[in-house]
Amino acid sequence: MGSAHDKKDILLGMMLIKVRQRHFYCFYICLFWSIKGLCSPWIGSLEPQLHQDLQVLVEWGVIDASVSSYPVPWKGVAEQLEKLQVHTLPSIPSISMQRLKHYLQTHKKQKGQSIISLYGATDDSRFVGFNGVQGEKVTLNITKEFYAGRWAGQISANHERGGESHFDKSFLAYQFGDWNLRVGSLNQWWGPAQSSSLIMSNNARSVPSISFSRSQAIRSENKWLQYLGPWFLTAQIGQLESQRAVPDTKLWMMRFNFSPVSGLEMGMSWSAMWGGKGQPHSISDWFKVVTFQTECANGAATCDDALESKLGNHLAGLDFKYSMMLFERPFSLYGQRIGEDVVDYYRVTDNANLIGLSTYLWGNKVFIESSDTNVACSNASTNEKNCYYEHVTYESGYRRYGRAIGSSFDSDARMFTLGINKNFRDGDLLELVINQLTLNKDKQKPAPVLNGMSEKILRLSGFYQAAYGDWLVKLGASIERGEVEDADAKTDALVFTEIKYRLN
């Protein structure tokens, strides 16, 4: 379309504005000291471990909320936390409860928080976890939260090695009743797994978007909705970066999760790439995408049904988690199934799968997970793989700045993970994870995470996090042994540290 249409899309990309480096900190400092704040509307938006604490309380049946979409709103959860007493809980959930209550009470007194953090590693990381190593080698971040009446916001200024500066994880939100309207970007994670999500994870940089979401994830007081149990809904329209095959591609994202019976949580996720430079991107075009209208793959005005293809690049699917008490501890079974193409309005094909199991042993949370994104193309005449996260029009794939928006291990990857989380009574954290990976076994069209055409990897990673007054220090490392076709096995090690200082 012409430039007139491009101007109409400015709102979708308003958080992608680039500024010169000499203005970057000046802009932030002016806002930093002029805004009085409270705490974030979401749990763990600055400290992801708080989300894992919340999951612990839900698994132990202490909190009644739907928590498979990160981040979860504080509203409704905070009221339940304030009623809990330490002496009534077993050791593991009592530690998580105290961490969450401490965070909540501290920020009520402080009227918000301002944080400066520095992350440094010996190298860039190929794989990113929910709460561990980051992708970039060096990042300086300054964050300020603020709150005024129904308004809430966060300004997050980031400066990376090489001189790039951006405002990822900055947002402005307005709450009305049980709903929330947000403009900006926020790390998200959709699904019950800890090592990866097939559709939305924090592996890639957060997508700037306009979001309309429920402002709580607890039971509704509406009698017509009470049968859902605790539930959460979000719908978002975002815009990807300009440095891709189709610049400024739009991204539609929608998620609904609910807990209809005690111990069971179910979720439905959907995302669709559409628009961008050279592609139709009006409101009517978006409506055609979300109503699954078709076009001829050969570009003709009419064609046989076999040549019809849905507009846009769709991913959609389901996830579940069922927790039960066995031997006086929770056992959780969970899974996720996300497909890329649809035969009709409801039958999704080209499916990738993830399954996991978690429980608590010797004071630790232990989880085992397996996923497979080796997916045969439903429209291919052979058993060709290399289709997941890929698209004939959107050649950069379901990625942002080269990293998959979904799985940390990208497409054509088999993953097996064993992990341990330990929360200490003094607030310290320990995580250890072992990954066994097989990447691009068919040696065709390797994903960006590969060092060669095909690779087998055994990886050990972990971190220890401790608080010292207003300081929060995380030390971690990863070591991986990779076997690449026609090359000697190679061992790579990475050490990282993240230091956060609370300024108020």
Briefly describe each language-model feature range:
Residues 189, 210-394, 411-412, 416-418, ...:
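Signature for the C-terminal beta-barrel architecture of outer-membrane proteins
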Residues 38-131:
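N-terminal periplasmic/intermembrane-space "pro-region" immediately following the signal or transit peptide
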